[in-house]
Amino acid sequence: YENSPLEKVIKQHNPGRVWRENGRSLKIDEYVNIAGNDTLGCFGFQLINGAREALNISVSKQYENGSLLVTRSEDEDGVTLFEFKDRLERTVLERRIESRLKGDKQLSDTYYIYDDLGKLCAVLPPALSDQLSVGNIPAEKLDMYGYLYKYDVAGNLMAKKLPGISWEYYVYNVNNNLIFSQNGEERKRGEWKFSIPDAFGRVCLQGVCKVAIDPFDNPYLKPIFSGLSNWYVCQYVGSTEYGGYQFSGSLMAGLVGPKPLVQVINYYDNYDFMYRTDLSARDEFRYTHEEGFAATSSSAKGMLTGIAKLHTDAYDQYRNGEYGVDSPYNYSVMYYDDRGRLSQTVSDNHLGGMDRDFFSYDFNGNALRHLHRQTGAGNEILSDSYTYEYDHAERLVKALHRLGDAQEVILIDNVYDDLGRLSRKTFHNGLLNTSYSYNIRSWLTGITGSSFEQVLHYTDGTGIPYYNGNISSMVWKSGEDDIMRGYHFTYDNLNRLTNAVYGEGSVLVQNQNRFNEQVTGYDKM
């Protein structure tokens, strides 16, 4: 600990004798920024939120001495991160030292820029940070390299620009529910994705529409200031063409072109939709009790009770102007027990038949049994069932499967060690066994099976030892081949892989360099 009443941690030794013997630990130091210093200096920025997508960012002089807290953290292999925080504890800079060439440090800086309300408005990656100088940052550079964000009056993310793609827009209602979104490709087609909630914020309708919306002048937020009671949601009334839902107020007032393409319809709280949709004459969607499985509750308040999904070819019809509101849906109905757990689902399938699933649980809610029964158009019934077993810590130890009337098969049989780690897995009645080994830090060190064997080395083996979790070398053999094959790995100062050198034999010195991989460089995004 630090030699002060604050008792801050300055060094941390994690488990492992080899780390202790080699003096490998995590180190934490704290400094303040120093203007003009190549390691502890940090640029300041001025941000002006312009009209629409415009973001004007200029580089001002560096922060005054002592105005930022700098935390230097170093892992067990000396890889270092400097994190600069302002007085509001916001991270304004993350600095990594990539290399030192001829006495000059090659820095990898990521700057974070906030507005007056503390919202993150821009992230400048190292590719852009390397080009910074005092003055305005050219708009074309921000457009090419910057991660840019703009917010509406309610503080919701309204527009986002990532490198290499167009702006993405987001539109919210007065409850801060996302109701419309659009990416660059959708903008070319004049389309918006919509996700309309009910009064409780639960998504009821999802799909695509062509509607005239300006995300920078969001009409759906105006009730916040005008005192109107229109929340711009949808409500189930049971008699409209949108799966029984009705849009509130002027939610689709800016609609242009065809009617909205509703791709997903969600129903909640009850099963009234079954009597007012295509399901009204289909008794096969009704609840059917199955002995040994959970019974349904008389109330489904607050639960998702039904889903209707439009056939996948409807979107192509919509784009070609051929879509009609009578396009077919596939339905699923969900039933729950008195503890709100899924007890039964009923769905129609692409074969013209039905799928029905039954579930049962233990006291803690772990699934014990699952029965799946499918019928095709010819009323042929296929069924398969699953049974699950758990240990005292509620870890899955066995999963069994039965297809029709065939003999039950043990799909998986898991064994755990005293630390709760998976140590052995057996498949299909013991036909295939796989064992796993770990080091003191629970890093995977070996996989041993009947057809494959692999060993991972971190601090041991024949390669350069790494103590921070990077793999130093690995060897493997497969099938009946007794030849051990493997790679030695090396990394740069940012923990990025630079070389993978191939070899064979127990120490990888035979047939070297046959399948080497060399990374000559990384971008700085």
Q: Which stretches of residues belong to each language-model region?
A:
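Beta-strand elements of repeat-based all-beta scaffolds
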Residues: 1-490, 496-524
